[in-house]
């Protein structure tokens, strides 16, 4: 978050591991980043590592990024050849309005935008989130909830919905159980309507079209 608190971060990672919590490390792929030491640390701690291409949001506008393909090539020079980690997924293919066939397809592991690779000299998986050079908007299944209760639909735009207004709505003449049920229904309806209008794609390649002005530390993850 722009502070020199490395010791606190490392202590926090260790504490989380000791508590048995699942831990992974996300690192922004900046041009001046030395990824080797970070990979060695993650390997030593047995923690999955993911590299995220820098996006022109907030402080990201001030830095020069590089593609994850370039970074992966750099890591191969140090840790051997890499291979995408996939699994066989069963998928249905429509032949006609009455006939379907079932076939298998190799797809990347995980349910998000990261594509994971196994390097021959590493035991940990290394993931790459390539928002710029591997645009994955058509399969994006992510929204963000800010600390202010605002549901963001895309990092590129300020579009979304303020869930606080719904939570603070007055429900009178009902018992607490019915009030909670009514609020849940309102939240579900509002979130579905907002997500249905999620932008088709980001516009990071055209920063002048961006409408989001907040820093990532305010947006959250």
Task: Describe the residue ranges of each PLM region.
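Radical SAM/AdoMet-radical enzyme domain recognition
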Residues: 1-52
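Auxiliary Fe-S-binding modules of radical SAM enzymes
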Residues: 44, 54-57, 61-221
């Amino acid at each position: 978050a722009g502070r020199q608190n490395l010791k606190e971060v490392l202590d926090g990672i260790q504490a989380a591991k000791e508590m048995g919590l699942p831990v992974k490390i996300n690192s922004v792929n900046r041009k001046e980043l030395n990824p080797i030491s970070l990979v060695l640390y993650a390997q030593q701690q047995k923690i999955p590592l993911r590299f995220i291409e820098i996006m022109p949001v907030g402080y990201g506008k001030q830095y020069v990024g590089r593609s994850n393909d370039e970074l992966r090539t750099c890591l191969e020079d140090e840790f051997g050849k890499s291979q995408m980690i996939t699994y066989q997924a069963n998928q249905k293919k429509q032949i006609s309005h009455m006939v379907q066939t079932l076939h298998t397809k190799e797809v990347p592991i995980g349910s998000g935008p990261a594509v994971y690779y196994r390097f021959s000299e590493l035991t940990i998986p290394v993931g790459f989130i390539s928002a710029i050079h591997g645009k994955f908007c058509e399969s994006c299944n992510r929204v963000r909830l800010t600390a202010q209760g605002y549901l963001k639909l895309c990092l590129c735009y300020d579009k979304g919905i303020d869930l606080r207004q719904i939570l603070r709505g007055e429900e009178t003449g009902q018992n607490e159980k019915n009030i909670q049920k009514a609020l849940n229904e309102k939240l579900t309806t509002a979130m579905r309507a907002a997500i249905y209008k999620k932008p088709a794609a980001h516009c990071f390649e055209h920063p002048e079209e961006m409408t989001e002005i907040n820093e990532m530390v305010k947006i959250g993850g």
